[in-house]
Regions:
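Amphipathic alpha-helical interaction modules
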Residues: 234-238
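Conserved beta-sheet core of the metallophosphoesterase superfamily
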Residues: 99-213
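N-terminal acidic leader/helix
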Residues: 214-223
Length: 268
C-alpha cells in the first residue's frame, strides 16, 4: 500500500446540530453546514494527498439516504485520499451506492503503522475499548464516538488509571473536533506526539478527586464478588435500592458518595 495512513473520526457531515445553526453540541464554532464543510474540505486537503489512505473511525455522514446521495458523493469526492470507513453508530446507509464511495466499510480493523521508526499494531474502532487486542504488547488503539463530552473525560481518566494499575493501554480519541486534530486527518506519529498536549487534555485530565477511588472500589468489589453484576456491585457499595433507580439517579447517588468535587459535578 503506497501513501501514508491517516486517522480521523466523527466528521458528522450534513449534521446541522454540530453547528450554531442547530444545537452546537460539539461547540465546533461553525455558523452553519456550508461553513463547516468548507473548512473541513480545506483543512483535509491541506493535510492529505491522493496517495494517502484515510481511516475514518465512524460517523462520517448524517442521514445517508437516497435523497442525499449525490450531495454526499460530491462532498466525499472533494476530499483527497483513499477513504476507509470504520462503521459508527450513525453510519446507516440506506443504499449500497454509498459503499462505492469508500475503499472498504467494516466495523473494526487492525493495521500496522510506523511509530518512532518501529512497526506498531493499530486497533481501529469507533468505540473506546480499554482491553483491546495486544494492549499488553504495545498495540495502540484509536477511536471516536465520545466527541469532547463528559464521557470522553471519563475515558481519559480510566485509561490513565488502568496504566497506573498495571494494565498498559495506549488509547487516543481522534474525533475531528478535538483541538489537536482540528478537522484534518493525522498520522499516528502526530497523534501520539500531540495528544497529551492538546487543550482538551490539559483542561479535562486534572486529578480526578475521587474518581479513581470509586473505580478502584468497584474493581475490588468485583474481585471479591465475581458472581455479581454492576447493579449488584453498586448495591453492595452504596446501599440497597440502586437496582430500582434510573441510571441518572444511580449516578447521582454515586457522586454523592464520592464528594462535592468540581469534576464530579460535570457527570452529575
Amino acid at each position: 500500500m503506497s501513501g501514508r495512513k491517516l486517522y480521523i473520526a466523527d466528521l458528522h457531515l450534513g449534521h446541522s446540530n454540530v453547528t450554531r445553526a442547530g444545537k452546537d453540541f460539539d461547540k465546533r464554532g461553525f455558523k452553519d453546514l456550508n461553513e463547516m464543510h468548507e473548512v473541513i474540505t480545506m483543512k483535509w486537503n491541506n493535510a492529505v494527498t491522493n496517495a494517502d489512505h484515510v481511516y475514518i473511525l465512524g460517523d462520517v455522514l448524517w442521514k445517508a439516504n437516497s435523497k442525499n446521495y449525490y450531495y454526499y458523493r460530491s462532498l466525499l469526492k472533494g476530499l483527497n485520499g483513499n477513504k476507509h470507513l470504520i462503521l459508527g453508530n450513525h453510519d446507516n446507509f440506506s443504499t449500497n451506492r454509498y459503499r462505492k464511495l469508500f475503499e472498504e466499510i467494516i466495523p473494526y480493523k487492525e493495521v500496522v503503522d510506523k511509530l518512532n521508526g518501529e512497526n506498531k499494531r493499530v486497533i481501529l474502532s469507533h468505540y473506546y475499548m480499554p482491553f483491546y487486542n495486544h494492549h499488553y504488547r504495545g498495540a495502540v488503539m484509536l477511536h471516536g464516538h465520545s466527541h469532547n463530552s463528559a464521557e470522553s473525560d471519563m475515558e481519559r481518566r480510566l485509561t490513565a488509571m488502568l496504566n497506573r494499575q498495571g494494565f498498559p493501554c495506549q488509547i487516543y480519541n481522534v474525533g475531528c473536533m478535538h483541538s489537536y486534530i482540528d478537522y484534518a486527518p493525522r498520522t499516528l506519529q502526530y497523534i501520539v506526539d500531540h495528544y497529551d498536549n492538546s487543550a482538551d487534555y490539559s483542561r479535562n485530565a486534572r486529578e480526578d478527586d475521587g474518581f479513581e477511588d470509586m473505580i478502584q472500589a468497584l474493581l475490588d468489589y468485583h474481585k471479591s464478588h465475581p458472581d455479581k453484576g454492576f447493579i449488584q456491585t453498586l448495591n453492595g457499595l452504596l446501599g440497597d435500592g440502586i437496582s430500582s433507580m434510573t441510571d441518572k439517579t444511580a449516578v447521582q447517588k454515586i457522586c454523592s458518595h464520592i464528594g462535592n468535587h468540581s469534576e464530579v459535578k460535570k457527570i452529575c
